[in-house]
Amino acid sequence: MTDYAISKKSKRSLWIPILVFITLAACASAGYSYWHSHQVAADDKAQQRVVPSPVFYALDTFTVNLGDADRVLYIGITLRLKDEATRSRLSEYLPEVRSRLLLLFSRQDAAVLATEEGKKNLIAEIKTTLSTPLVAGQPKQDVTDVLYTAFILR
């Protein structure tokens, strides 16, 4: 063999591993890009979960004489409910709901309600009072939160 033939063969053998390496690098890059784009799409879908809009039910304000002499509670509340079915049940039985709440409010002590802890306890009591079924055979009402819209002690 001549020197020219040997150098041509060595150049060819040098190019083959380089081309194989470039091909593997291109395939790896394409695979990573494909995997990464699907990961981003999956993360976007997780973030785009539809958050249900809150269901609120505003009640008219209550004016109640407290157990203390000459003390009056003026209170307005809005209920945050789990779903529209609960809202329609509460609306259908509104006189029963208001009666339960009036009885609950009239049993309160003004000194206790003046504190933040007393107001938080009242929220828990409202949830408990309204969670019991309005009529036998109905499911419990799911009141997730009680929001004060007016609160005056006189």
Swiss-Prot record:
Pfam families cross-referenced by the UniProt entry: FliL
CC terms in the record's Gene Ontology section: bacterial-type flagellum basal body; plasma membrane
GO MF term set: identical protein binding
Transmembrane segments: 13-35
Coiled coil (residue ranges): none
Keywords per UniProt: Cell inner membrane, Cell membrane, Chemotaxis, Flagellar rotation, Membrane, Transmembrane, Transmembrane helix
A Gene Ontology BP annotation from the UniProt entry: chemotaxis
Protein's cellular compartments: Cell inner membrane
Membrane topology: Single-pass membrane protein
Top-level taxon of the source organism: Bacteria
Similarity field: Belongs to the FliL family.
NCBIfam families on file: PRK07021.1
Function comment: Controls the rotational direction of flagella during chemotaxis.
Listed name of the protein: Flagellar protein FliL
Organism: Escherichia coli (strain K12)
